[in-house]
Amino acid sequence: MSLVSIIVPVYNVEPYIETCIQSLIRQTMGNIEVILVDDGSTDRSGELCDQYAEADERIRVIHKQNGGLSSARNAGISAAKGEYLLFVDSDDYVSASLVEKTV
């Protein structure tokens, strides 16, 4: 089964990021990596991402200076190991079968 890299740009989304991450780790397709790119958040977004990464080996966090959405996505692409890339915004809640149905 091919690895799917899910790239999530993160910037000051403390109220939403946990819901997003929880929806990603519940995916029915298990062969995923979640790359959270903290684009210089000034709230607790980056800290929350780190907590999830410590608890789940499928999650990686990249912390970088703020460079905007495209810069964050490009950082995620560079770090991705998957055959397929999936982009999710940090305020999204996705269905548990999103990756399985997409791939």
Predicted features, each with a name:
Residues 1-103:
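Nucleotide-sugar donor-binding/catalytic module of glycosyltransferases
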